[in-house]
């Protein structure tokens, strides 16, 4: 039951993009087409789950054991940066088709605050390993849901006549606001 | 280079929030009130100036290939400093900003200035650039925070202007952040071009 609550909460109620404001840069940057949105979601899911598992072990067995939790920010971001590089190299070798699909998005992920944010949240909420995996995976699903829905709306938005001053970023932000309002309907679900 | 131009570009011409759309996560996440926006802006300014200084000083010693990880370590060190100082002296602000303080590390504005400016320019210009960009960022966050606070609860910096019961709660909540920033961006762009 706890797992179920974690999943629903991470995907809908506390959606990582629309209510936690993490990962806004890719949310606004790569949401012009649905296909790129799907690619980005795949890459984020992949890295987010692995990064959360690795940072979980680092927190548990290195930082807490030696009482150096103040090094959390530095160690986590370094691990994530190295991990992204590693994933890129491994994918290139092991699965060229997957690398083709996710490749361009991987370098962008180091500075995606959703990855670091989820890693820190996992630690600060004292999740165990299974909960951490479930939480990170469903956060990634929530990110994908928001990103792909938003990309779909923006594809439609290209066809309408937007007032001159609102073109580009302003109209995208207002649309994102309306989408966030729709997601607020899930509040109180868990 | 003209230092005044270098300083002032962060406010209007190349404002990090309204024009370059950098650092959107903290911009939207912490601006439920003007004071939170200002606090976040100043914390980011500190990190930005300090990392610009260090990057400008060590740029000749860092091999090209590992420059991004090195910049991230430099930035992360200053973020840790900010985190500890704030926790010790401003615990209320520390609580309010929460997760977004460690996330200054991945603020694309900070890394962006280190990579695009400080790694190519002299120490003096880098300090001025960091100050200008940081204060421009603070200005944008404070403006957004003030707008949301005013419409949401009828206050600015905690000073009550009209009764809270007339406030529109939506501006304090998540959707209001996007909508307020959207209209504010449109407004600033209009002013900038005029």
Positions of the model-derived regions?
Chain A
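Helix-coil boundary and interhelical linker segments in multi-pass alpha-helical membrane proteins
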Residues: 1-5, 57-70, 120-131, 187-190
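Structural signature of hydrophobic alpha-helical transmembrane segments
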Residues: 3-18, 66-82, 133-146
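Hydrophobic core segments of alpha-helical transmembrane domains in multi-pass membrane transport
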Residues: 6, 13, 44, 49-53, ...
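Generic transmembrane alpha-helix signature in multi-pass membrane proteins
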Residues: 21-29, 88-93, 104-106, 113-126
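C-terminal ends of transmembrane helices
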Residues: 22-36, 84-98, 150-161
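Cytoplasmic-side transmembrane-helix entry/capping segments in multi-pass membrane proteins
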Residues: 35-46, 70-76, 98-110, 165-171
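Ordered, amphipathic secondary-structure segments that act as subunit-interaction surfaces
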Residues: 60-103
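Interfacial loop-to-transmembrane junctions
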Residues: 155-173
């Amino acid at each position: 039951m706890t797992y179920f609550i974690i999943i629903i909460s991470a995907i809908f109620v506390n959606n990582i993009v629309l209510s936690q404001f993490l990962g806004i840069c890719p949310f606004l940057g790569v949401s012009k087409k649905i296909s790129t949105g799907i690619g980005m979601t795949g890459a984020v899911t992949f890295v987010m789950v692995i990064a959360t598992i690795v940072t979980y072990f680092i927190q548990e067995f290195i930082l807490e054991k030696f009482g150096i939790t103040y090094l959390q920010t530095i160690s986590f971001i370094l691990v994530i940066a190295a991990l992204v590089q590693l994933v890129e190299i491994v994918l290139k070798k092991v699965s060229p088709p997957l690398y083709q699909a996710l490749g361009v998005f991987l370098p962008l992920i180091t500075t995606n605050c959703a990855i670091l944010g989820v890693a820190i949240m996992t630690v600060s909420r004292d999740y165990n390993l299974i909960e951490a995996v479930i939480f990170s995976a469903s956060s990634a699903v929530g990110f994908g849901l928001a990103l792909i829905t938003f990309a779909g709306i923006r594809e439609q938005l290209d066809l309408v006549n937007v007032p001159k001053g609102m073109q580009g970023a302003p109209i995208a932000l207002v649309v994102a606001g309306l989408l966030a309002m729709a997601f607020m309907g899930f509040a109180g679900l868990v | 280079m003209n230092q005044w131009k270098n300083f002032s570009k962060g406010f209007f011409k190349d404002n990090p929030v309204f024009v370059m759309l950098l650092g959107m996560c903290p911009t939207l996440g912490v601006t439920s009130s003007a004071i939170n926006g200002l606090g976040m802006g100043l914390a980011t300014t500190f990190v930005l100036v300090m990392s610009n200084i260090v990057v400008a000083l060590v740029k000749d010693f860092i091999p090209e290939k590992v420059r991004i990880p090195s910049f991230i370590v430099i930035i992360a060190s200053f973020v840790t400093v900010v985190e500890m100082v704030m926790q010790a002296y401003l615990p209320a602000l520390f609580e309010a900003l929460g997760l977004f303080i460690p996330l200054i590390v991945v603020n694309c504005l900070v890394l962006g200035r280190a990579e695009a400016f400080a790694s190519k320019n002299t120490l003096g210009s880098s300090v001025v650039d960091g100050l200008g960009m940081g204060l421009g960022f603070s200005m944008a966050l404070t403006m957004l925070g003030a707008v949301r606070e005013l419409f949401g609860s009828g206050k600015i910096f905690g000073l009550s202007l009209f009764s809270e019961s007339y406030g529109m709660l939506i501006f304090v909540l998540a959707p209001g952040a996007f909508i307020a920033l959207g209209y504010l961006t449109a407004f600033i762009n209009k002013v900038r071009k005029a």
